[in-house]
UniProtKB/Swiss-Prot annotation:
SUPFAM superfamilies (alphabetical): Ribosomal protein S6
Descriptive protein name: Small ribosomal subunit protein bS6
Biological-process GO terms, alphabetical: translation
Function as written in the Swiss-Prot or TrEMBL entry: Binds together with bS18 to 16S ribosomal RNA.
């Protein structure tokens, strides 16, 4: 299994319940396709650097996971057709140095915070 990280941005107009539902949906897609989720990092609602689909803000999430390579095409397909996702990025960690960084990130986040809370980002003017 390969090491991956997916960052996705949800529409800012979603309620907290809808955001949690979409997060669970993405996690379900991963687990149904044999992925092992290491860590989920909710980064909160932040201002975007530029407008995406007429939105100036978005709710960010990062998920660190291990998965077979055939899952990535399915994950991309699901994220593309999900209307609430305004942008996503999937990163594959390949060499030893990258994998060590992935492990440090995913395990460091787990150990440093028992319950991860959204980060408070300063407002950008």
């Amino acid at each position: 299994m390969k090491h991956y990280e997916v960052l996705f941005i949800l529409k800012p107009t979603l309620t907290e319940e809808e955001v949690n539902t979409k997060l669970e949906f993405v996690k379900e897609v991963l687990t149904k396709n044999s992925a092992e989720i290491e860590t989920v990092v909710p980064m909160g609602t932040r201002k975007l650097a530029y407008k995406i689909k007429k939105y100036e803000r978005g709710t960010y999430f990062v998920i660190y996971f291990k998965a077979p390579t055939n899952l990535i095409a399915e994950l991309e397909r699901v994220l593309r057709i999900t209307e609430e996702v305004i942008r996503f990025l999937i990163v594959k960690y390949e060499n030893k140095k990258e994998i060590a960084a992935w492990e440090k990130l995913s395990h460091g986040i787990k150990q440093s915070k028992k319950e991860i809370k959204p980060l408070d980002a300063p407002e950008i003017q």
